[in-house]
């Protein structure tokens, strides 16, 4: 059910009603004002410009704005997933001049009240973070799983030259097998995805806590979630259909506001075998940089113990620039009371 933009307010706790903020559902007309207060967010890797319109059209999602004196100062998106039991929080941003004043907490509480009033079956709030969790966070949240974050940048043209040195060029699967001793990975169609992820338990030990994390979004293994994922432009891959050890999802590249001709490539890697993870990583790079021209920020999420060796491979063998040291992507949740 889509909440209309008039937004019938839930009965708010007194602390929220006294916060001096006005809340509304975002519309297309708000886009420019939202982006004006979002400068430099997420290190220039903001996905909102490419997803804003589709978010507004998503029947399971509501994008909420907080205003102060009529000006947009914060945004948060909430999406109901997991068969209606989970409120997924995404896209949170607060205007620079309002940060550190508790605005994010007020907006999150408002969204929780709104979702509970509209979807009483929702039980938990889930979100994905990459900052350092402190003692207060552990009092509030349960950690569902974590992945290491490997962020790198390169020029697409330079990377293609390095890949060609290994015989990896163009969209050619057969060349990949000449560089890796294992058989080439299997790219899955929708039927194979359903079979592996929903109709068998073959991937339960590969996925962290039986959770699919796709571009910061954590999903339980449920048909309703798979329906959401299969609408997206994603390459799904495993090393072996009959006995998978490593699985990966690569979100198709999209432009980001870090600068002209900059793209973002997101790769979610699951499994503990370094050689197989590296093989699938190379395949995704080969496939998705073949037609790109310009700069690419590539972010790969992988099992934390694999991070160091994969980072060394990226730097020493592929000659890409590592943007930052080891950080973690943490999926956390709390009960909606």
Curated annotation (Swiss-Prot):
Tissues with expression: Expressed exclusively in the brain and lens.
InterPro entries linked: Acyl_CoA_acyltransferase, GNAT_dom, Hisat_C
GO terms for MF: L-histidine N-acetyltransferase activity
Domain N-acetyltransferase: 21-157
EC number: 2.3.1.33
Keyword Protein transport annotated: no
Propeptide section residues: 1-2
Superkingdom classification of source: Eukaryota
Residues of the signal peptide: none
Miscellaneous comment text of the record: Strong histidine N-acetyltransferase activity has been detected in ectothermic vertebrates and not in endothermic birds and mammals.
Matches recorded under PANTHER family: LOC100145250 PROTEIN (PTHR47403), N-ACETYLTRANSFERASE 16-RELATED (PTHR47403:SF3)
Function in brief: Enzyme responsible for the N-acetyl-histidine (NAH) synthesis, which is a major constituent of brain and lens of ectothermic vertebrates.
Protein name in UniProt: Histidine N-acetyltransferase
Species of provenance: Oreochromis niloticus
Gene: hisat
